[in-house]
Amino acid sequence: MEIRRFPAAEAVQGVAVDEAHVYVVASRAIGKYDKTTGEKVGEWTETEQGPILHLDSGVIVGDRLYAAHSNYPGIPMTSSIEIWDRKTLEHVGSHSFGIYRGSATWVDFHDGFWWVAFAHYGGRSGEPGKDPSWTSVVRFDEHWQERGAWVLPAEVIERMTPFSNSGGSWGTNGLLYLTGHDRAEVYVMRLPTAGSVLELVDVLDVTTPGQGIAWDRSGQEPMLYGIDRARREVVVFAPNQPE
């Protein structure tokens, strides 16, 4: 169920959220907005010749904003996690994966681990010989050492094709919520008890056509934040949470 929405010029790729602010992510810019009023209170913009090319979904962990970054639509795909001070929006760090499993599209921190999706695409944005079925969700420890990886089930890949997994955020119910690039749906996933394929629990209909999402876990009632890219708006939901 949609609760509210407000305009944000950076509503192109994704969002991150903490107890007081929403961080709205464009490819090379971030806007910081008051969560209650929707007023813009800060921003960061990459320089014309700067190294940050294509930011995507983000997450707040402690005093830092972490965002997935890639050279999309470049080939070969390269990826990194870029880091900002959430108070000042000063860029303070980077972890580079180099050429790895694909194009990093979202990052989250859950159950003591980092989780990152590495997307693959169809058409001209894809790597030769690979398609969206090569997309994976990878678990890392605090030192960014890989500690497990999973792929998406065929029925979810079919709904995302020719694009891929754009957003992801862990719910307080222990389930993983994923989005594609253009469909107004959220895919609720569970880690399998065996094998390498995530289990599809539910498909939620929403009013935002894909892109990055973030659970606001700071209050008693968790809220899901997303963006309406066409309207350049941040959208807040109170969806049902399956168990």
How does the language model describe each region?
Residues 3-28, 54-57:
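Beta-strand-rich domains and repeat architectures in extracellular enzymes and scaffolds
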Residues 13, 68-78, 117-134, 236-237:
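Short, conserved, GDST-rich strand-edge loop motifs in beta-rich repeat architectures
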Residues 21-24, 65-66, 114-117, 175-178, ...:
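Conserved beta-propeller blade signature
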Residues 78-88, 131-144, 186-193, 239-241:
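Beta-propeller blade signature
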Residues 196-218:
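Conserved blade-ending motifs and adjacent loop-strand segments that build the rim/top face
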